[in-house]
Structure formats: structure tokens, C-alpha cells
Regions:
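Carbohydrate-active enzyme catalytic cores, enriched for enzymes
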Residues: 236, 240-378, 427-433, 505
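Short, isolated positions in well-ordered beta-strands
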Residues: 80, 342-344, 376, 409, ...
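Extreme N-terminal leader/anchor segments
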Residues: 1-83
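Residues that flank catalytic or metal-binding motifs in active/ligand-binding sites
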Residues: 102, 203, 333, 363-365, ...
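CBM-like, beta-strand-rich accessory domains located in the C-terminal region of large
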Residues: 1-2, 10, 151, 197, ...
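Asp/Glu-centered strand-loop micro-motifs enriched in Gly/Pro and often flanked by an aromatic residue
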Residues: 73-98, 111-117
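Short strand-coil-strand connectors
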Residues: 76, 338-340, 372, 405, ...
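Aromatic-lined, polymer-binding surfaces characteristic
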Residues: 95-277
Length: 523
């Protein structure tokens, strides 16, 4: 019965369309947006791309051009020797690592090295890598033909083509364009309507870019209509992406900017989409302004999305838009406090969209604290998806929050599943305090108040006749912790970036009815 209940409490939140398309895919039916690309295509168009994303120094540093030249690839802090003209899959690496192999983001590191040094070997290597992929990845076989990997690869290949078209050998250009079109057609028949969320967004974004690239007006009309509708669905009124991850917010924002820049370059101005730029930039800026890394709420890591500087640069250059700080993100439930050289971000949001909470953590009422941009009190991060550590990093204990009677806030299971969920609401808030109420998966009701005073933060957790467990994860000696009872101090796993784990000190308290903790701030 337990397993039946688990599945029921997961499935009941899904849209009927998701269940239908999941079953349709199982029996091999197509999943389209009601339109597929023209099989006959002529000349391609050099679409305008926001090259500052592909030339973002922080992004380029993730890939070593010399390693790539010498047949070594590194993703998510894990390296492999790879000859390219062999099977594009490593069973000893994670699914996410293998996905990254197929994204082709590393092309731009080699292009940058070529631009800086004039060494043609880097440029020729990009051609060899693409040719090898085309040869070694037959249509529909392996993770390289997963719709999400197609999305990112085609986005990168189109940018690559538009940046290098004049230098590419004619024979290779023909081969590259042919492969892009084949993948475009395949993607259009395998849209992720069963998953939705950021996956569906990326599918639609890629269809729009490919439609512009192949000058397919019928496909452009259909894909752009669907893309606009999905933006309306996924972008909240405060500008935050509805999956409530600062990292995925930037990934989605990048996709939106790529579409708008490409449309503008084609003489198409979509005001409805362009009106999203300012609020989405404000959200990204408000999270990261003055910080050395992205805040760790829900699935998040510092080595995936592009840098905040690249977003600011592109928005200014392309649209004359500059960011504004917002302390209240009421629709998404994030509240940001700044004073002196301190910054605190509080999460009072829901689990995420009810039908796709796959990137959710048990981090309700948690917070992160920074001093001079450096993390002081932090959540534990994400590390990976299909790994044994997944459950820990999604758990309540890996966040600076509270649980009752040992009950997880929400019932996270598998890599991307949530069954019973908590709910959160803000009872009151002002410029130096917030009072929140959480109802966990077992219907326990608990309150948390966070008060900021000149030299301290007071955290008060209450739940009548229940045993509370409050956790704080400390990465700096910039604070001192005090409570009426002595804390238990342990070492836990910490992953501010995907693919690498270090240690963090966790303080936790167990007490009935009420726990009050004071964080004294250093000078």
C-alpha cells in the first residue's frame, strides 16, 4: 500500500495531458506542436545570436581548450580521455555528465583559444568533434538524441555556425546543416509535453531558433505561438521562473534572450516577450548582486548557468535595460535583506509548480547569509541528479530550516519526484523581520520568525507539543551561534557546484515546542 500511495500522491498533481503524452511516448506515438518542419530546405539564414553568452569568461573557464585538443574532457569536476570517434557514452559517469558531453558548450572554449592564439588546431578540432558526433550518433540512439540534449546542442551549433560560417569548409557546412535539420525534424516529433516545465520551454526555444535558421515561416509561426504561451505559463508576475531555482531562472532567461535577439535580427519585435526582460533581469540581479556565487535554493549550482555579468552586459547592449534590485519577490516567495556588508535571502515559497516539482528541495523557510559576498550560513547545494546522494541534498536537514518529529517537509523521492508536499505562507513581514507558517506533508503546523537586529539575527521556531529540529550550516567563522540549549555539531556534505562534494559544519537543536537561536554577526 505504501508504494501505491506514493505513486498516487505523485501522479494526482500531474496534468492529464502529461499522463497522456507519457503513455503515447511509451507506445511510440509522435508528440508535436501540431506542425513539423518542411523536409525541403534551401539556404540557411545567419541568425543574430547574443555572442556575449558564448564568450562569457566565467563560462569559458569551465572548459580547458588544451585538454580538449588533447582528447580529454572535463565536466562537473570529472575528467575522461575521449577520442571522439568512438561511442559517446561513459557508463562510469553520471547521466548529467553524459548529457554535458552532447551539449557541445565546449566548442566556444576552443573558438576562444583560436581567436586569442591564431592556432588553427583549435578551430580544426571543433570541426572534428562535430563530424565525429554526426558519424557516431545514429538517429534516435543514445542520450544524444534525448530532446533536452538536442535543444542545447542545436542552440550551440547554430551559434557556432553563425560565428564561424566564413571559415568553415564547404563540405563540412553541408554536413553540419544537414545534421541540424535532421535533429530539428526529430525534435519536432519528440516534444516533451509529458515533462513540461523547463524541458518543454527549451524544446520550443530551439524550434523557434531552428525555424529562423531554416527560414521555415510555417514552423516559426507555430513554434513562436507555443513559446509565447509557455513563457506566460512559466514566468511569474515578479519575474521569477516558476520552478523557483535561481540557476534554472538564469537558464530560462538565457533562452528567452536568445529568442528575442534572433527575432529582432530577423525584423520581428515581440513586445510580449520583451516585456519579460526587465523583471527577469531584476530577479537574477537581486539574487546575485554583490555575491561570489549563486544562492543555493532548490536544484542549484554555481557551475551550470552563465554569469550574471553576461546577462547584465547583453541586456544593456541589446535592449538598453539595466537591473534594479528588488527585495520582495512575493509571487515566488523570496525575500532579500541587505544591511551594512551583509545580505540574507529567505525562501518562503512553495515547492514549485504542482505538476513539475522535479527540481524542488525541502528548503521552505530556509535562508542563506552572506558577508562581503561570501557565504557564511548556506544550504548544502545539489551535487547531482541520478546519484545516491540525491535524497540527502533534497532533504530538510541539508537546508537551514526546521522539521517536526523527524518528518521531511515534503515527500521527495526518486531523482525528480515529489509526493505529499508542504505549503508555506508569510504571516507578516517588514524591513527587518519575517514571520512564516509551514504546513508539512503530515499536516504539522509550525512557525518561523527571523528578526534582524544591528549585530545579530534571531531565529524562533515554534510548534505546539511537537519536537522541533532546527539546522544551521556554517562555512565561515564570521558568526557565533547561541541558544538556550547546546547544539549537536556534525559534519555534512556540501556541494555549491555540481559534481564535487566538500564538508560543512552543521549545528542542530532538538527541542519540544520552541527553539530560539541567535546568530551573532562579526564586525
Amino acid at each position: 500500500m505504501g508504494k501505491i500511495a506514493l505513486y498516487w500522491n505523485t501522479i494526482k498533481y500531474m496534468k492529464p495531458s502529461q499522463i497522456y503524452y507519457r503513455m503515447a511516448k511509451k507506445i511510440g506515438l509522435r508528440c508535436t506542436i501540431g506542425c513539423i518542419p518542411d523536409t525541403n530546405y534551401g539556404d540557411v539564414a545567419l541568425i543574430k545570436t547574443p555572442v556575449d553568452f558564448d564568450k562569457d569568461p566565467v563560462f569559458l573557464e569551465r572548459f580547458d581548450a588544451d585538454e580538449l585538443l588533447n582528447n580529454k574532457v572535463t565536466f562537473l569536476h570529472s575528467s575522461k580521455e575521449f577520442l571522439w570517434n568512438e561511442k559517446w557514452a561513459f557508463e562510469d559517469q553520471s547521466a548529467l555528465w553524459n548529457f554535458n558531453l552532447h551539449y557541445f558548450e565546449y566548442l566556444f572554449s576552443m573558438l576562444s583559444a583560436y581567436e586569442k592564439t591564431g592556432n588553427r588546431d583549435y578551430f580544426d578540432k571543433t570541426i572534428f568533434c562535430i563530424e565525429s558526433w554526426i558519424k557516431e550518433n545514429p538517429e534516435g540512439e543514445g542520450v544524444g538524441w534525448s530532446p533536452y540534449t538536442i535543444d542545447l546542442r542545436l542552440t550551440n551549433w547554430i551559434s557556432y555556425y553563425c560565428m564561424t560560417e566564413k571559415e568553415l569548409p564547404t563540405e563540412f557546412k553541408v554536413k553540419l546543416i544537414e545534421s541540424i535539420h535532421r535533429q530539428f525534424v526529430y525534435l519536432s516529433n519528440h516534444i516533451e509535453k509529458d515533462i513540461l516545465g523547463n524541458h518543454y520551454f527549451e524544446d520550443l526555444k530551439t524550434l523557434v531558433l531552428c525555424s529562423l535558421f531554416f527560414q521555415d515561416s510555417t514552423m516559426l509561426q507555430a513554434s513562436l505561438k507555443a513559446f509565447k504561451a509557455e513563457c506566460k505559463e512559466e514566468i511569474l508576475s515578479d519575474g521569477m521562473h516558476f520552478e523557483l531555482s535561481p540557476m534554472y531562472h538564469k537558464i530560462i532567461f538565457e533562452g528567452l534572450l536568445r529568442v528575442i535577439v534572433a527575432l529582432r535580427g530577423n525584423g520581428i519585435k515581440e513586445t510580449e516577450l520583451e516585456n519579460l526582460i526587465q523583471p527577469m533581469l531584476d530577479v537574477a540581479w537581486s539574487f546575485e548582486e554583490g555575491l561570489e556565487r549563486i544562492p543555493l535554493f532548490n536544484d542549484c549550482g554555481n557551475n551550470i548557468a552563465k554569469s550574471i555579468a553576461s546577462f547584465v552586459k547583453i541586456c544593456k547592449k541589446e535592449f538598453e535595460i539595466t537591473p534594479h534590485f528588488k527585495s520582495n519577490l512575493e509571487d515566488s516567495g523570496f525575500y532579500i535583506y541587505k544591511w551594512d556588508n551583509w545580505k540574507m535571502i529567505v525562501d518562503a515559497g512553495q515547492v514549485g509548480p504542482s505538476y513539475i516539482p522535479g527540481h524542488a528541495h525541502c528548503d521552505a523557510m530556509s535562508f542563506e547569509l552572506f558577508k562581503d559576498g561570501k557565504p557564511v550560513i548556506t544550504n548544502c547545494g545539489t551535487y547531482g541528479y541520478q546519484c545516491e546522494e540525491r535524497q540527502f541534498f533534497r532533504s530538510t536537514m541539508s537546508h537551514n530550516t526546521v522539521m517536526v518529529d523527524g518528518v521531511e517537509q515534503s515527500q521527495c523521492w526518486g531523482a525528480f519526484r515529489v509526493a505529499k508536499r508542504c505549503s508555506v505562507r508569510v504571516l507578516s513581514r517588514n524591513e527587518n523581520a519575517i514571520l512564516m507558517e509551514l504546513i508539512d506533508q503530515k499536516k504539522n503546523i509550525l512557525n518561523r520568525e527571523i528578526k534582524i537586529e544591528p549585530s545579530k539575527i534571531i531565529i524562533t521556531d515554534t510548534c505546539k507539543n511537537k519536537v522541533l529540529k532546527t539546522s544551521l550550516h556554517i562555512v565561515s567563522n564570521e558568526v557565533n551561534i547561541n541558544s538556550a540549549m547546546k547544539p549537536v555539531i556534525e559534519v555534512q556534505q556540501y556541494a555549491p557546484e555540481y559534481g564535487i562534494i566538500s564538508n560543512i559544519t552543521v549545528y542542530y537543536w532538538l527541542q519540544k515546542n520552541k527553539i530560539e537561536t541567535t546568530v551573532y554577526l562579526g564586525e
